[in-house]
């Protein structure tokens, strides 16, 4: 059994309880400023409505108004927690207890966050501090019980759940968690009693039936187990975990059709669920359908290239299909991943003999015998015992909680609902109206040169990296743009902006060229060329991206020598694109004016596209030094750091980005920054 279920209980419980508790907590002190009251109310209201990013925005403002208000950091920590930003939440909860060392709720929530990182000793210390401050707050015992469970101190977990249940005897979650703890203490009788009690308290919650059904299955009471899964599914027809478990139960009853139907149902909702694909592959092979078995196992390997069982079993499919060379490659990979895999050596020996590689076959056979003998000497078991241990390599797998989700996310490199890309380049664009610079507490970037440049335009122009800037059409601007007044460089620049808005990219580049080549009539005209180079660089990069998008839509299929399409990394064709002209333009912009953060941000982005990641990090850092509230720069630098395997720093940057209003950051944090502990 995995610890994931009880943790998922906690997370689900927290989703509902975190906000309720937070909003019921007393808020002391009277704010001196009306604005502070307004932002505080808006932040708490957003929390109650589940609008966590909006809540963070309001608490950000409060944190700048008053850096000593521990409630502000506490509430912001709750919002970050619910967005998956555990590091950011941990930092805010730590700040809340630093500002108020007797803040019970701060220690409580800090402990919960620590436990998600697997820092159970620290979590238990924080919970003990909270209990010392408020021994009568019963919810602390529930949280500490969960933490003890995760720390594998099951007897202490039972003790804390006992205390909680004495005060809250009608909370089914407590019985479910105590039952799970008792299972690990091998007390199946009391565990079953707890599951029965949880079901009696809430017969409309499928989790109780799933837990009890799995317990019945472990006792080989499959009829009772399937009955409980049927009940769970009737309560929640979208509960894929119930279908998954029922499939294994049907399989144990040799009802392969029913098992396959349930696995198909899981994959309908979660088409990339690696564990379900793996199990379906094994059943397909067992009934002789090797084509479907291969399709599923290929996907498992694509999702998780380090899965030794997938290579081992796919090799056996190839053996049954007499595809000896393919089988040999997979046994090679399985042994590479698991050098002590005696059964793989034995099977590879057989494949090598079929390929006429007699010397290699004899060598592998001897290695296999030696490993079996070593195993027997260490365990005191005979070959029959060894044979039994190998059964697990070709039997269905079962896993608790979010079964295999972390693995199958890797296949797509992004969540289905989260677009993990660099934040785009900044540029000047036409707009229906000019920027409103009267942003109170919005940390707007102010640069006198940019402001003068924009104010001198004949038409509304803004600088942005968003595609949501409204422009109802360029016709209304044409007279002002082509009136012939003003400095030539600015006039050509405005014409280029109009062409870009109308998607006349070649014409736009000509106008940018003219703006850059124009004579500088005064010092400002010379400095304005930083913006001309910047926008031309962006245009050049966009044109390259457009070409690459067309070429990448043409897919290449590679066939092996037996006519079977194989999806392997080595078969994929990639092409790099030359951004050197765009990079050169951006570097010239830096040479003209060296304190515009947007230019350094754009240069860093282009360096990423050119695979110059270390240089890119330096320029993102420069952009941040010039504009510390540039969330986009934190976001992109975080992605690059994660790509370069500096995950800790990358996740800190993403947390800053989310705090600064980049909502995409929280989707990336959930994908890359949540640790294995607590998942």
What are these regions (language model features)?
Residues 35-37, 70-71, 104-105, 138-139, ...:
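Helix-start (N-cap) detector for alpha-helical repeat units in TPR-like alpha-solenoids
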Residues 41, 75, 109, 143, ...:
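Canonical tetratricopeptide repeat
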Residues 320, 342-524, 542-581, 673-679:
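Eukaryotic alpha-helical solenoid repeat scaffolds
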Residues 48-49, 82, 116-117, 150-151, ...:
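Register position in tetratricopeptide repeats
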